[in-house]
Amino acid sequence: MPSADARPAGRPRNPELDKAILAAAERQLGEAGYAGMSLDSIAAAAGTTVPAVRRRFRSKAEIVVAVIDSLRIQSIPAATGPLRERALALLRNFHANLLRRNSLAVVGSLLTEERRYPELLDAFRRRLVEPRRAALRQILIEGIDAGELPRGVDPEVLASMLIGSFYARYIATSDLPENWPDATLQQVWPAAA
């Protein structure tokens, strides 16, 4: 029986090919949607073969989940420092992630496919949306408890307003200005003078 330390047979995976496959899948998901992408087209765009893609991903849905995971270019900031600054760091982090090429198009594709493939949007919510909202909600709760935000403010509604403003701004103007995180937070949690 082989030892637990034994390497699997065969050549090690090429991390550059892994990146190329994910980039091709992300581009196709953003441009053609889930229904418009295929393992064949992903393999061709990545400069590889379908068997090479299948060795990494069992299905198109599994590739999309990997794309969703790759959309988080920056981790959620650590929970240290003044509360308002933590909220601002989280919103700036969200902004940076949204500005990544294809991020908003991928979100649009997932929304479009929700009726046929609800598990894809669910994966997006679980892996990206819920952790960020939970972190922001916690900061808002701490801000209310510390008296920095008014009592009676609903942290769930406020989190939706702050995060939702990014999507609303983009839909209305096709633009997310660099100062958007600062401008939105200033409306509900003014900086000390």
Question: Where do the protein language model's features map onto the residues?
Answer:
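Amphipathic alpha-helical packing segments from all-alpha helical-bundle domains
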Residues: R101, A105-S109, E119-D145
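Solvent-exposed, amphipathic alpha-helical segments
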Residues: A24-A32, R86, L90-N93, V106-E113, ...
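DNA major-groove recognition helix of helix-turn-helix
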Residues: F57, I68
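C-terminal peripheral helix-coil segments that are non-catalytic and often amphipathic
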Residues: M1-A6, A89, N93-A96, I141-E142, ...
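Hydrophobic alpha-helical connector segments
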Residues: S75-V107, L158-A159
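Basic, helix-initiating cap at the start of DNA-binding domains
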Residues: M1-A32, G36-A45, P51, R58
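Short amphipathic alpha-helical segment with a characteristic S/N-K-E followed by hydrophobic residues
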Residues: I21, G36, S59-V64, Q74-S75, ...
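All-alpha amphipathic helical-bundle segments outside canonical DNA-binding/catalytic cores
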Residues: A123-L128, D145-S160, A172
